[in-house]
């Protein structure tokens, strides 16, 4: 692309004039380092704030930049996690004791699913490389694809069935699907008895609360017949992967919505098997690079809030 930068540019003139001149990497790094040292000497190490996004890469985002903040001595390091994935991280930890999904980006795993359900996840536009790979596997196997999204997204245009849910109705819909599956005894009882702790109490709770398709229809703006059909497809699929992402993570009840979808995957036996999972695409690896104690900076002030 003609717009791609291939070397550092330094502003000349006033800010906003949009005038820049190319400089070498050595000059750029030297000038930045000198300004950082000046700020640290004048205002303290806490004057430096670091913000890192996911596009820097997991190892850089959660590893090197976090490590640099500890070596520099600033507590003011933040990523996109609080508004991108904190809800699902907590949900994964509460449900399975680990903050990441339990399946892999492989054809033998994700390509084995008979049903792919994209729940608030527009992968075709937001993660085209991932989607292209997974969708190629899906088409190769001849698997079905359902998209649950208020908008007719690019991902939805590829689906066998698009369910235009009302924004915020995700947890109600998932609870109703679970209610139907339990009521019709469509759950994988053998899997539940072997691997799902507390599933009988969960079943009793769901049925007692009355989270029926009729109850959820008014919250999700989806017909009872559609809710029942969705439950049937998930329960009868020989391997179903439910993909969640920003549509779940950045809305109300994020943590509990993620947990309910994890429960849905669990009671249908879609956990820890090829082609079966709840896979939140905001997932990241837990990385904690260790730093020798004598190299850690002394952080004197608390993190800014």
Language model features with spans:
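Flexible, glycine/charged-enriched surface loops at secondary-structure junctions
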Residues: 43-47, 187-192, 241, 272-279
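N-terminal export/assembly segments and adjacent metallocofactor-ligating motifs
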Residues: 1-184, 223
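Non-catalytic, charge-rich alpha-helical accessory subdomains
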Residues: 217, 222-242
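Conserved active-site and cofactor/substrate-binding residues in soluble primary-metabolism enzymes
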Residues: 23, 27, 63, 168, ...
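Short glycine/proline- and acidic residue-enriched helix-loop micro-motifs
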Residues: 12-20, 201, 212-217
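Conserved short loop/turn motifs at secondary-structure junctions
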Residues: 49-57, 218-222, 245-252, 284
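Internal, active-site/partner-interface "lid" segment
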Residues: 185-213
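A glycine-rich, hydrophobic/aromatic-adjacent loop/helix-cap motif
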Residues: 234-305
């Amino acid at each position: 692309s003609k717009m791609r930068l291939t070397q550092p540019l330094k502003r000349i003139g006033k800010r906003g004039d949009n005038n820049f001149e190319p400089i070498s990497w050595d000059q750029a790094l030297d000038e930045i380092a000198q300004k950082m040292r000046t700020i640290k000497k004048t205002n303290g190490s806490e004057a430096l704030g670091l913000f890192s996004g996911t596009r820097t890469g997991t190892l850089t985002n959660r590893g090197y930049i976090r490590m640099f903040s500890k070596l520099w001595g600033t507590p003011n390091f933040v990523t996109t996690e609080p508004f991108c994935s904190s809800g699902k991280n907590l949900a994964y930890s509460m449900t399975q004791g680990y903050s990441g999904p339990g399946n892999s980006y492989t054809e033998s795993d994700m390509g084995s699913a008979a049903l792919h359900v994209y729940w608030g996840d527009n992968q075709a536009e937001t993660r085209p490389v991932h989607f292209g790979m997974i969708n190629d596997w899906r088409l190769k196997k001849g698997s079905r694809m359902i998209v649950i999204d208020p908008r007719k997204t690019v991902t939805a245009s590829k689906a066998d069935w698009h369910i235009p849910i009302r924004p915020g109705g995700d947890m109600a819909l998932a609870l109703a699907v679970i209610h139907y599956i339990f009521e019709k005894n469509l759950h994988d009882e053998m899997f539940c008895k072997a691997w799902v702790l507390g599933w009988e109490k969960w079943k009793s709770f769901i049925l007692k609360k009355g989270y029926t398709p009729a109850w959820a229809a008014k919250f999700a703006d989806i017909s009872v017949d559609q809710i029942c059909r969705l439950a049937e497809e998930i329960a009868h699929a020989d391997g179903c992967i439910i993909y969640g992402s920003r549509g779940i993570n950045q809305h109300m009840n994020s943590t509990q919505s993620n947990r309910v979808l994890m429960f849905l995957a669990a009671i249908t036996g879609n956990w820890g098997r090829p082609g079966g999972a709840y896979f939140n695409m905001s997932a990241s690896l837990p990385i904690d690079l260790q730093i020798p104690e004598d190299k850690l900076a002394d952080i004197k002030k608390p993190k800014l809030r």
